[in-house]
Amino acid sequence: MASFEPILTRHIHREDSHTLSGYKNVGGYKALEKMFKTMAPDEVIEEVNASNLRGRGGAGFPTGVKWGFIPKDSHKPTYLICNADESEPGTFKDRLLLNKTPHMMLEGMIISSYAIDCHLAFIYIRGEFYQEHKILEKAVEEAYATNLLGNDILGSGFDLEVVIHRGAGAYICGEEMGLIESLEGKRGWPRIKPPFPAIEGYLRCPTIVSNVETLACLPHILNRGADWFKSIGSEKGSGPKLYCISGRVNNPGVYEEPLGILLTDLIFKRGGGLIDGRELKAVFPGGSSSAILRADEIDGLRMDFDSLSAAKTMLGSAGIIVMDETVDMVSVCLNIARFYAHESCGQCTPCREGTTWLVKILNRIYQGNGSLNDIDMIFEITDNIGGLIDFSKGSFGKTICPFGEAVAWPIRSFVEKFKDEFIAYVAKGVEVS
Amino acid sequence: MPLIKIDDKEIEVEKGITVLQAAIDERIEIPYYCYHPALSIVGSCRMCLVEIEGMPKLQVSCNTTIGELPPERKKDGKYDMIVRTQTEIVKRERENVLEFLLLNHPLDCPVCDQAGECYLQDYSYKYGRAHSRFLEEKRVRKNEYLGSNVIINHNRCIMCTRCVRFTREISGTNELFVQARGDVSKISIFEDKSLDNMLAGNVIDICPVGALLSTDYIHKNRFWNLEAKKSICTDCSVGCNILVYSQNNRIYRLNARENHNVNGYFICDIGRYGFHRYEDAEKVTSPLIRSDGGFKPISWEGALKEIYEQFSMSMSGEKQQIVGIASPFHTNESLFMFGRLMNNIFKDKSIIGKLPFIEDYEIHFDSGFRISKDRSPNRKGLLDFCPNLEDEILQKVKAGEVRLCYALDDGVDRKLDEEWESFFKSQRFLVVQTYAMTPLAKLAHLILLGPSPMEREGTMTNDQGRIQWLNPSVSLTNKTRPDWEIIMEFMNTVGKRELKYTSVNEVNLEMGERFPDYRGRTFFKIGYQGLPKKNITTSRPSEGRQAIQ
Amino acid sequence: MAQNRTFKFTNPQRVEKILSQYPDKRSATLPLLHLAQEQEGYLTSAAIEAVAELVEIHPGEMMDTVSFYTMFYTKPMGKNHVQVCQTLSCSLNGADSLVDHISEKYKIAHGDVSQDGKISLVKVECLGSCDTAPVIRINDSNYESMTVEKFDKIVESI
């Protein structure tokens, strides 16, 4: 592996990395000063566009392009929301940033707000992140105390208020329209698009929703330039990336590597290989919403947006969950299906009814009461919830938000790739009866 | 204007409307559940998916707006959008959505009130699959009361949330909400804050399936037994358009009928359940004459003879006063005839009055829906056709003169205070035209049997000046005669006229001849949506009198 | 369900502060609900109505929001509210046996409160601590890399 100097997590081992002074000691808020002194908002957008920064929340949409969707002639206020509602199974990178270097994200928020002319920004933090919330509150307090937030920030004439908003336990609020509804005090039922949030988001005003990690990249882009950022990783996706490794590996954790690193390097080098030297069976490359990969599919596979979508899965949240040879794939599939049934918001017919149906069928198979027909049914039901998946043309979602696809992809991939295990369960049931 | 193609049909549409609206306007069927033209768009039922050329996935037609493409990007060189509603993929998708909706549905159509007018039934029949693939146990929940008149059957609910949006966007009362999430979510109310507002019954109308049920109608009849009549509500001066469902001359329920010039899509609960008042009233079944402190039936011939004896005296110069009491509950045609009788036959011996108007709270909803404080249907018509109405009739009536009174009864809503009671008691002869033994009827010497509001036919003028057709929802019983006909007979008998109208339409034509504002406002012209008055004359008393004479 | 008939925020300044942070009142819903729940341990009907009044919506609409989120409780939880993550990484690393242990020891199933009111148990979805699976959460604190023995010790100590 080529040597790579961590950028986002470089200083997190320091005891004071989460404090303002700790952050400032390692060059924190320098980008902000530079921006206020030398850059107009349009120039910030240009720089971010040039950096090829793509959103780290899951969809991988280019950040600068998203900013560009805000109507120029709008008389309404513009809002920025930092999406810190990290809840994708197998994902804990934003939590690390919130815990260890909240100011990096805050600096990114100020930069982003300046670029899009936002004066009130929110951090929507997952309700379960209690400690992180406390740390973040302290960080925001410090920022206000030193005029990094509030009126006339650092004498620039730019004003920004930041409000921390706690969620209350709902996976779907990580979806931007669900998040916006939730911030408005409603249930987190994703609103139908169009209009898109950049046109009509929070309180029907132009709104940009950005992931924690995405925002944390911004100070570095401004500090060291778009070209530098672009030089990290591959053509297909540039910049540093936080990868989460969990499951049956020796060294689970968050690892910062360039976009495009080999999946095998992450599992076997960073993750320390599998527990007890067992054989790798399967891996989720991008959280539980990505299609699962069999051990024989990962050789040479690079962790970037395009390579993974060519492999008919996705980078998603870069939550890598590793399963070894002893793992029962039927039970894992049932576990995943349960998660989605529990988290389905219940708004769209296919998702509300289909997720529970899947759980019931999978449970029946797991209990030994399944039939071969059930296996085919699972294919059909996942298609009917998430759409026929054609990677050459994009996904064919059938629901308001991408949750439908997020259910369909993994469940379908389990049955497709480990069909023999499902058949074995069916056969076992036949034997018993 | 954008030019689009839906299947094989070329349509020019207004820019900005949705594909579903365009299809509905063109009567191209795209099935849907959560969409309702009066409510916000949520796009959650996924039933209205269609194929749109150039879009990678199916789109919900309810949220896809039609814009204009620049010339070089037009589809097939001329279309701004090409929509396909009948392709294999669209059909399969409908089948799939229906399968999901029916998974936990009890399929209890034989005992469901919605059967026959159920979109789940209809679409399943048209677009659904023939067999069920669901082997699991169904989700079962108990029925619950949402309000005094509304029950929910959760098992039949498809979570389209039309009812929830109705309470937020139309009634503005917010009682209904979605409880919990995912497949355990259900429509609910908060503790004792039940669904009891003046518009509550509409949620039953807009529920596309058999989930929301009326306690008033539950298990009373089957939809296919009922005959629907398009009419208007007579419980306030708004004149909401309604559908009256009956079988064998018995009314079972009222639904709202769409009219964007009057009530939109909804009606209030006063009107919805109001017809029971006529059922509960003590009915009059024949003309009656006072006898030994009570009443006894009398034939129509006998009744007219009695009228002749009492009233024709007044024509012969004896100083008498004829008091006519008109009513804002009657049709324009009846009031027109009544005005003629009083003004043209009794002339200056007559004086026309009315009882105090029946009023209550005026209720306005933010959505624009309105219940008028004027709880009679035809005050405007009354003022138009009896322009010389005396407001202070109690004072105007000269004391001591022999008095004969002919009163059109307001009906079951009318109460009499002591002053009015003694006024009527002081009449030498009191004729009351009514359908029920009301307090006023009880004072009569002679009762003429007219139709109840559900039997009446003719036009009413609502408080916006819109002329609408009151269509009888049940037919006249044996001895009942239309109000206008009774008045005509009165005129023929007392005034020696030879009027021979054979239907309310003939009266309506004559009325139009004499009142220019009403010219051409025949049933043929106004249809079931009504038309505004022409406003050729203003109804100043003097002009009105000229029109009569 | 015995519930308090009235509810009053004990910290009105905090309420004012929260309301002042948002451009509209309704956006203050979630933080106000959190505050009310901190005060009483769960959301009583009176608290739900009080928050609804503050943000000027119908209590029904407030319940619409409350019932959507798993972290809002409309009935009392145990003094120690134990939440066991059951999502994949935790499940792969022994979350199920933790649930079995707690269920057996305190005679409670998912969603129950022990008879003495000391412990309540819910199975929850991913707590975002997959690298230290299995993870449980007691009240507001996460406890990582759990074992049955560790759990018993922690419960004793708090």
Model-derived features: positions:
Chain C
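Signature of N-terminal electron-transfer/Fe-S-associated modules in redox systems
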Residues: M1-I158
